[in-house]
Amino acid sequence: MSRPASRPVSRPASRPASRIVHVNGEYVPEDEAKVSVFDRGFLMADAVYEVTSVLGGRLIDFPGHAARLARSLAELDMESPVTEAELLAIHRELVRLNGIDEGLVYLQISRGNPGDRDFAFPDPAAVRGTVVLFTQSKPGLADNPAAKAGIRVISIPDIRWGRRDIKTVQLLYPSMGKMMAKRAGADDAWFTEKGGVVTEGTSNNAWIVTGGRIVTRQLSDDILHGITRAAVLRLAREAQMAVEERPFTVAEAKAADEAFITSASAFVLPVVEIDGAPVGAGRPGPVATRLREIYLEESRRAAI
């Protein structure tokens, strides 16, 4: 089920510069964008999303994000109202309309507006999903000072639902985790299971470097299948770095030589402190620093 994306538009010359967003096939100023109060994304968090970075006005890892979007939709038995080619065209048009050099494109697809509140899924033949995209300008995205200073994380219990591999908009607990970190004077939080086993960060995958090996948790329903994670794994192996996919604990992370996170918006960021304890020398290590360099080099080369 698809429909063509609306024809590219130019900014109206008569109005002040305003961010242009995309809603269900239309490009509109953000203050004119509308989604029904009965939309299931709003009422039920019945929606999935993706965030794609933009460097030099081009999209980073778009095919991976599109593939994960398709998987998330399939896992929730949700049909996409747009094709991958249409989504690519919309991403590019929003980048153009909003003059994004470095930043993000946010995409969300919900199960749509059935006309009233109801727990039961609507008939997809009768109710089309809602498609929303917008950009965020982030000058200096690739030059994040945290890459040189490192970030501090705390560990918190992981009480989320069991399908963390589906990228849904159910982000209340991750948001709470970020606020817990902020109140503790840290930058982010790592979720932990019984025994202090790390699952992932609030919006990123978690890694350590120990015994000469790069370690990150293996894919399962327990963690998000990070697109940047996959790219960093591939690039590390291509660089002849030893990689191991397995669980690790907070205690092991504190005793590691290095720790870091990966995500579409952070790329690779070193973790220099966990629960107040320094990791390694307490400053960004050579492995995380090199992986960030390699990832950014490859991303710029392959961007579309």
Segments the model singles out, each with a brief description of its role:
Residues 189-191, 205-208:
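Short beta-strand scaffold segments in enzyme catalytic cores
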Residues 198-204:
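Short beta-strand/strand-turn micro-motif
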Residues 212-214:
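Active-site beta-strand-loop-beta-strand hairpin of nuclease catalytic cores
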Residues 1-190, 194-197, 220, 224, ...:
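Conserved alpha/beta cores of soluble small-molecule-handling proteins
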